[in-house]
Regions:
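Terminal, regulation- and interaction-focused segments at domain boundaries
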Residues: 1-42, 51-52
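Short, flexible, solvent-exposed loop/turn segments with mixed acidic/basic and small polar residues
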Residues: 5-10, 64-65, 94-99
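Short, conserved charged micro-motifs
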Residues: 22-29, 84-85, 116-118
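Short, solvent-exposed coil/turn segments at beta-strand boundaries
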Residues: 22-23, 69, 100-101
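Ser/Thr-rich, low-complexity intrinsically disordered terminal regions
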Residues: 32-85
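Short, surface-exposed coil-to-beta transition loops
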Residues: 89-93
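Beta-strand/loop substructures that line and gate deep hydrophobic ligand-binding cavities in soluble
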Residues: 94-110
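C-terminal partner/receptor-binding element of secreted or periplasmic proteins
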Residues: 111-127
Length: 127
């Protein structure tokens, strides 16, 4: 897992997984794997899967990296506490999955809750 700052301000965790290093064959397989982790978690709640690839390609001026085969986000929330109204601005969580010919790139922003952050790291590392 690599930690980086994207665009000089977004704390991001990313892992590139060669298709030869996993039994998962597609973006949908990776999303289903993560959804199973969310569904098994006592607090996490699945919200939606967003097909970013289809959305961006449907736009008149949409630009997609030609190396991408697919790109989706799985959206979910841990939300055990809501101490401040502003917390909604950093929720829910999202894990992005981009598929290329050779690999999957799985990424997510740092979570404000260290336990939630650790769960996401573990889920991605288990792929």
């Amino acid at each position: 897992m690599k930690h980086l700052t994207l665009m000089d301000k977004y704390p991001l965790n990313a892992r590139t997984i060669a298709k030869t290093q996993t039994t998962l064959k597609s973006t949908d397989d990776v999303i289903a794997f993560i959804k199973a982790k969310i569904d098994a978690h006592p607090v996490a709640t699945y919200i939606a899967t967003f097909d970013h690839y289809t959305h961006t390609n449907s736009l008149e001026n949409g630009e997609m990296n030609p190396d991408f085969i697919d790109a989706k986000n799985i959206i979910f929330c841990f939300g055990v506490q809501l101490p401040k109204a502003e917390m909604l601005g950093i929720r829910p969580r999202s894990i992005g999955v981009v598929e290329t010919e050779e690999s999957f790139v799985v990424s997510f922003m740092d979570a404000p809750n260290p336990q939630a952050h650790q769960f996401m790291i573990e889920w991605v590392e288990a792929i």
